[in-house]
Each structure stands twice: as structure tokens, then as C-alpha cells.
């Protein structure tokens, strides 16, 4: 059966006739709380006017922005007029008008709106300007996608890619008739960006805010400081940017990617002046987005300590801005000098950011320095604290009191709940950001603290979104689109009162492995669109297949906005299983099973070359009779819709394929008893911290393969995962022997191998040639070096072997 993918490429330059023919009339993300389709459509043309209440400056600004966007991208000029003004020439009373009409309707809340779209009139109702703004975001998504375009330059690039398309100078824009009653499920709908690890430009921040607004997010969490960089100007303490915004170099690749670690030798720097911060705050406010700044404390403080060493417990120690990722022992020392410094910093931050919340971090604070510090031990005794955990709580409480005294509220990561005691209570209005798992959120809600949910398993967009082997270098962990969409921020088991403290959820983008704008967008979208629906749409209205349907048109909007969104959803992956005759049967399936319901066209090659529109069309499972590198991609109308250079998988066919084996030493991980995982033809994979398809051993690897009959053989190849940062070393020696009866074995080869080999992690296939011989059984013993050799990252630690596919020929 042919799999075809209808991605609606024709909608790039959609005109009214084509648009009217589509059945996907309503492709709004996030899905409205209630949408009732109606017959017909309203047409925006040169006779349309937008009417706003007289002298309502905020609504006029919203209407002006809407009209300007339409004119810029379509050439249609829509005047914005006071509601009391005369109609345009040729307009009948109450026709071809978009009417902004404020109402008093408690059911809409402060962010809800009502849209009534008929062929003659659009009525927009809301109780606040914020509600009107969100109504306009919905109108954008009811209009043809060209309306949201980033501008003429990008339209030109689209025309270059699609020369047959017509420039988007349209005579009329259709909006399908409907009635929408809409408001958000949660009051806090956030997205986050870490600029400490990698710095991002003002232009990118504005684009990020634009995309957030289109998806009705209302809070931007700006992570401004970390061990690897201090990114905000503090006038009273200029060394924070003179020194703390600069690092001498940056680790290359994954944290565990090389042993020893490799650095690029290139200085890295960047920070935002206070004027630039004000510019971003104003821009966000124009999008009805509040910014929550984060100043990390007491941990993640190396950039600050490099700038001002006397804020540490060991001022004489030399500190440098961190050049690699991770958690560092050096943290702020809880001295009065440190608190005075932090109050100075927070005073300037509070003056820059008018929002209610100040995020103070509070996560991942090692306490070894505090345990060894005579000052800290005296402070614990003086304040009658029990231990360093309570000392952290004391630190957080001091900052909490200061921020509260300024009329603001703190947000902290869920570690701020630790070290609690009757005299170390947080202020009642302290808000907990739950990141490690949902338990912190449950605990905080039951203590009557407000909670923002952002658990890593649902909301960490630095995690990989597809097959680890196929994705760019990332932190690790798996977070596909479907998992994001499945999230319910309100944990089960909370009472109604406790559940009321769950303010919403937030998507986080930590940027250790995200150095560019393009990669940031790749990691964010479309997963952020899924989260937008999680936090806006009523739980009962969520529907993942319907979300995917709407997402197909939404991708076209993102194309117009020049967003480098991930096309992982369109990936198709080859998988293999052995056949009874020693070959492999390959299937090509979507990464997301829900995509089976949408039509697509998958093509593949078996010689390692990039698939094209002329490559073999996948219709049914096919047979591999020899080893091959398979690459896959999806196409529509001859154009790739997945990334043709992305999906690549090697398969091995040999005389051992599908053959049973016996392990004489038990493994420590992996499932060698299931589907013959060492002889199933599938090679192992690795990405981030994720490893699949290998079997690990703390002792020697000792295996006997039964070929089923006597065969002429001359070579054995074994795959090993060399990952010395995780103590997975190559063997020190490999012994191979053969047998006809499985009882009496004769040695054929003993080979020394380099167990001390470090360098780049990855799979190493070692080949052992022993000349032509006849055998049914092959015994392979790979000798473990037992302890990590000197010269590697963890010398003396127990070593393991990780074995991949076995090949016999």
C-alpha cells in the first residue's frame, strides 16, 4: 500500500478559490474552547473597515497591527475607524465590517473572547484588551497562511523555491464563518530561554516573542545568568559583564562525546545592556507577554564568582567562567557581603522588569563547599540550623524576604521546598516551578503554594524529539511531539483547592547544545505549539489526531514566518527483523504512529545515497540479502517534506543473521534473549545520553553462536560501543574458537586489542580474520579490561563491555 503525505503545499500562495475548496477550514492552534462552524465566509477586501470604540487607544493599537499585517503581506488596505464614524463609500450599514465591541461578561475572564463571523460582519467581543489581542491571533489563523508572513524578503525566497506560485498580492482574503467562545485553561502559559549557555540576539528574542504571541503564550522566562555566562548589565557591579559575560572557550560536541574532552579555543561572550532589556520588555508588553527574569542563586554562580571572588567561601581560589556544562561545586557563600551584592542586583533587575515575578533559581546547589567552610558551619550554629540543607533554605528565605519587601514575588525551582522547618517558612506567595518530576508540584500545592509545572519528561525541549541516532546533538532523553501533547499539568489526586494552585505550565529550552537560532527553532517548534494547546485548550477538547491535522496547515504558517521547525514528524524509520533463510525483512514506518492516518509518500535507498523523488517508493516490506545502509525520506509533489539527509540506518546480513546464541556470562543490561538482539541485523544507536541495541557486561563477553549447519567461514566482526566517559571500554583481547558439535572447540584466533583507546565515543567494529575453516558453532570471548585504564576520564573505575551486532562470514 502506497503511503502518501498530503502536506498542502498548494497553500503557500493560496488565493480565495483554492482556499474555499479545502475541508480544513479551521486550523487554529491552540484549539479554541468552543468552535461552531457556520456556512459561508467573510471576505476582507478594499471595502472592509475595522471599527473600534472611540478613544480606546489599546484596542486601536491592536486593530492597527492587524490591518498593517494584512496590508504588508497582501496589499489589501483595511482602515481602522472609530465606531462612531461614517462607513466607507459603498458600504451598507453593518456589512463588511470587523467590529471590536467590549463587553462585561464574567464567563470570558480577563483573557477570553467571543468571535462571531458571518459573511457580512465579524464581531469581536472581550472584556479586556488582552482578550481582543488573542481574538486577533485566532483571526490570523483563520486567514490564508500568507497573512502571517515575516515579510517580503521571505516571500521572495518562497517564490524562488516554488517559481510557479503567484506573488501574494490578493484581491480578497476569506475567513470561514463560525462562532468561537474561547478562554484559556490556565492563567500561566510560559516559554523559557536559557541565554547563559549560549547568547541570542535581540532580533531572535523578538521573533521568539512573536511566535509565542501567535500561540497565545503570555509569559517569557528569561534565564539570564549561569555558570557559563552572566548576560545582563548591572551598573553597580560592572565586572559581571566585563568578566562574567565572557568565557575563554567552549566544549565541543556532547559533554561525554570525547575522552578527554575537546574545546574549541574560541572566546565566547555576549550580554544585554539595560537599554536592550527595556526594549525587549516593551516589545513583549506589546504582545501581552510578561517577562520573568531569572538570576540564579545560590548555585550556578561561577560567572558571578569569576567576576567577584569575594562572594565565594574561598576568595583566594581562582575562578573562571565555566567552559563546559554540568553542575559545579562553587556556589555563593551566604555572607552578608553576598546578600548585599544580590540585593543590589535584584534592585536593578526589579527596576527593569515590571512583572510580578522574579525567578531566583534555587536548583542544583551542591553543598560540599558549605560543609567545609568554617564560616558556614558557624552560621548554621548561630541560626540554629540543622544542616546545610537548612542553610540553603535560610539563603532562599533571605532573598524571598527582600523580593517580597519590594512588592514582588519569587519563583524558584522545586528545590526551594527542601530544608523546611517551622522557622524557615517561605512567604505564602512564593511560587514553585516544578521541574524534576510532578511530586514537587504536588507537595507545593498541598502546602498552598502556587505552582508552575515544567517537568522534564514533558516540558524540556532540549531533549531529543525523534530517534536519538538521527537527531542533532542534544542533552538526551526522549520527548516526542505526542508526549508533549499528552501532558496534563494538573496532577491527579489533588483536591479542588489544591488544584487551584496549579497556575499552568512552561516549556524550557536549555541551550548547552543549542548554539544557533536555527537549532533553537528546530528544538522548539512544533513542540511548543503542542504545549500551547496543553495550557490553553480545555482537557476535554484535546485531540491529538485533530491537532496533527491542523498542524499540517500550521507548518505553512511557520514557513511564512521563516521558522526552522523540526520535520521529525515526517520522518520514516527503517526497521528490520531476520527471516528464516538468514536475510532481513525491512519495514519503513512513521516515527509517530498517529501519522499513519495521514497520507504520505516514503522513498528510500539501500546504497547510502540521499533519497530523491526518483528513489524507490516504499509500498510493502522488502528483503535485504546483504548488508546495506538504508536512507529514507518523505516527499509530496516531488518535493522533500522530511530532511533527506537525516535518516540513515545500517543493517548487517551475515551467516549469523537470525541465528540463536548462548551467553555463558550474564549481561548487566540489554535483552539478548529477545529477538536475538546480537544477531538480528540491527546495529546499535546512540544520541545524547541515550544508547540502544547493545548488551553490556561487567565481566568477559562469552558467547556461542549456532549457525544451524556447518558453514565455511573466515571472518568474525564484532561491534563494540566505545564510551569511555561512561566506563565502556574496548576489550583487551578477543579469543575465537570453532566447533562442529558445540562441545569440543578448537582455537582459531587470539587478538590483542587496545582497551585504553579514548577519543571520540562511538561504535567500533573490530574485524578478526582467521582463514577459511569449517564450523557450525563459533565461540567468541572478549576479555574485559576490568578497570578503566590510566589516561581515560575515570581511571580505576570498574569497566564494562558494550557489545553490538555480531557478523560471521
What are these regions (language model features)?
Residues 304-306, 321-323, 327-428, 435-443:
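Active-site neighborhood of glycoside hydrolase catalytic domains
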Residues 128, 634-638, 784-786:
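Surface-exposed loop/turn motifs at beta-strand-loop junctions within extracellular Ig-like
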Residues 21-186, 519, 534-545, 549-557, ...:
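Contiguous, structured surface segment used for ligand recognition
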Amino acid at each position: 500500500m502506497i503511503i502518501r503525505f498530503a502536506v498542502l503545499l498548494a497553500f503557500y500562495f493560496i488565493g480565495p478559490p483554492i482556499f474555499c475548496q479545502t475541508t480544513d477550514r479551521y486550523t487554529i492552534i491552540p484549539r479554541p474552547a468552543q468552535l461552531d462552524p457556520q456556512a459561508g465566509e467573510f471576505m476582507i477586501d478594499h471595502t472592509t473597515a475595522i471599527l473600534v470604540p472611540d478613544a480606546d487607544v489599546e484596542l486601536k493599537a491592536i486593530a492597527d497591527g492587524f490591518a498593517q499585517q494584512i496590508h504588508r503581506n497582501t496589499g489589501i488596505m483595511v482602515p481602522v475607524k472609530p465606531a462612531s464614524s461614517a462607513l466607507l463609500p459603498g458600504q451598507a450599514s453593518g456589512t463588511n465590517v470587523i467590529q471590536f465591541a467590549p463587553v462585561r461578561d464574567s464567563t470570558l475572564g480577563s483573557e477570553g473572547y467571543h468571535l462571531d463571523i458571518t459573511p457580512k460582519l465579524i464581531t469581536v467581543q472581550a472584556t479586556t484588551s488582552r482578550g481582543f489581542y488573542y481574538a486577533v491571533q485566532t483571526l490570523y489563523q483563520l486567514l490564508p497562511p500568507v497573512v502571517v508572513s515575516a515579510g517580503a524578503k521571505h516571500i521572495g525566497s518562497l517564490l524562488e523555491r516554488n517559481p510557479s506560485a503567484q506573488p501574494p498580492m490578493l484581491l480578497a482574503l476569506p475567513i470561514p464563518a463560525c462562532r468561537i467562545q474561547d478562554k484559556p485553561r490556565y492563567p500561566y502559559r510560559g516559554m523559557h530561554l536559557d541565554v547563559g549557555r549560549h547568547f541570542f540576539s535581540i532580533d531572535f528574542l523578538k521573533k521568539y516573542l512573536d511566535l509565542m504571541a501567535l500561540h497565545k503564550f503570555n509569559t517569557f522566562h528569561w534565564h539570564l545568568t549561569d555558570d557559563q555566562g552572566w548576560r545582563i548589565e548591572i551598573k553597580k557591579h560592572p565586572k559581571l559583564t566585563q568578566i562574567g559575560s565572557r568565557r575563554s572557550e567552549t566544549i565541543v560536541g556532547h559533554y561525554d562525546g570525547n575522552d578527554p574532552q575537546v574545546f574549541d579555543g574560541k572566546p565566547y561572550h555576549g550580554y544585554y545592556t539595560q537599554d536592550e532589556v527595556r526594549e525587549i520588555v516593551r516589545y513583549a508588553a506589546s504582545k501581552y507577554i510578561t517577562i520573568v527574569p531569572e538570576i540564579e542563586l545560590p548555585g550556578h554562580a561561577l560567572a558571578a564568582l569569576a567576576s567577584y571572588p569575594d562572594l565565594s567561601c574561598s576568595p583566594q581560589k581562582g575562578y573562571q567562567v565555566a567552559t563546559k556544562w554540568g553542575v559545579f561545586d562553587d556556589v555563593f557563600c551566604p555572607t552578608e557581603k553576598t546578600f548585599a551584592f544580590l540585593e543590589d542586583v535584584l534592585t536593578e533587575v526589579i527596576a527593569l522588569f515590571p512583572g510580578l515575578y522574579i525567578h531566583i533559581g534555587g536548583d542544583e546547589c551542591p553543598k560540599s563547599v558549605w560543609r567545609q567552610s568554617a564560616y558556614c558551619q558557624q552560621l548554621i550554629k548561630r541560626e540554629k540550623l540543622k544542616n546545610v540543607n537548612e542553610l540553603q533554605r535560610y539563603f532562599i528565605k533571605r532573598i524571598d524576604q527582600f523580593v517580597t519587601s519590594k512588592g514582588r514575588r519569587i519563583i524558584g525551582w522545586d528545590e526551594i521546598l527542601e530544608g523546611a522547618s517551622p522557622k524557615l517558612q517561605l512567604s505564602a506567595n512564593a511560587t514553585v516551578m516544578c521541574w524534576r518530576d510532578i511530586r514537587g508540584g504536588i507537595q507545593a500545592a498541598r502546602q498552598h503554594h502556587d505552582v508552575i509545572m515544567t517537568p522534564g519528561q514533558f516540558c524540556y525541549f532540549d531533549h531529543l524529539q525523534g530517534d536519538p541516532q538521527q537527531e542533532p546533538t542534544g542533552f538526551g532523553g526522549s520527548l516526542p511531539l505526542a508526549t508533549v501533547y499528552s501532558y496534563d499539568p494538573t496532577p491527579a489526586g489533588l483536591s479542588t483547592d489544591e488544584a487551584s494552585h496549579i497556575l499552568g505550565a512552561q516549556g524550557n529550552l536549555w541551550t548547552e547544545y543549542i548554539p544557533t537560532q536555527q537549532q533553537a527553532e528546530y528544538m522548539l517548534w512544533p513542540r511548543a505549539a503542542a504545549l500551547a494547546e496543553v495550557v490553553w485548550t480545555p482537557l476535554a477538547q484535546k485531540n491529538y489526531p485533530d491537532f496533527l491535522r491542523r498542524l499540517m496547515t500550521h507548518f505553512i504558517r511557520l514557513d511564512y514566518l521563516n521558522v526552522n521547525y523540526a520535520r521529525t514528524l515526517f520522518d520514516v524509520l527503517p526497521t528490520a527483523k531476520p527471516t528464516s533463510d538468514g536475510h532481513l525483512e525491512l519495514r519503513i514506518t512513521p516515527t509517530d504512529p498517529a501519522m499513519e492516518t495521514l497520507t504520505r509518500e516514503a522513498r528510500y535507498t539501500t546504497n547510502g545515497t540521499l533519497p530523491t523523488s526518483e528513489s524507490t517508493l516504499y509500498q510493502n516490506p522488502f528483503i535485504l540479502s546483504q548488508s546495506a545502509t538504508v536512507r529514507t525520506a518523505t516527499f509530496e509533489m516531488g518535493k522533500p517534506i522530511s530532511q533527506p539527509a537525516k535518516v540513515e540506518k545500517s543493517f548487517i546480513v551475515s551467516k549469523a543473521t537470525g541465528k540463536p546464541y548462548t551467553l555463558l556470562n550474564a549481561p548487566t543490561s540489554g535483552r539478548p534473549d529477545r529477538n536475538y538482539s546480537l544477531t538480528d541485523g540491527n546495529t546499535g544507536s546512540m544520541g545524547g545520553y541515550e544508547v540502544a541495541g547493545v548488551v553490556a557486561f561487567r565481566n568477559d563477553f562469552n558467547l556461542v553462536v549456532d549457525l544451524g549447519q556447518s558453514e565455511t567461514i573466515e571472518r568474525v566482526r564484532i561491534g563494540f560501543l566505545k564510551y569511555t566517559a561512561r566506563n565502556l571500554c574496548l576489550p583487551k583481547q578477543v579469543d575465537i574458537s570453532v566447533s562442529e558439535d558445540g562441545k569440543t572447540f578448537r582455537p582459531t584466533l587470539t587478538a590483542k586489542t587496545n582497551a585504553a583507546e579514548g577519543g571520540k565515543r562511538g561504535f567500533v567494529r573490530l574485524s578478526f580474520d582467521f582463514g577459511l575453516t569449517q564450523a557450525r558453532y563459533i565461540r567468541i570471548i572478549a576479555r574485559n579490561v576490568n578497570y578503566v585504564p590510566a589516561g581515560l576520564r575515570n581511571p580505576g573505575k570498574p569497566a564494562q563491555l558494550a557489545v553490538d551486532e555480531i557478523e560471521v562470514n
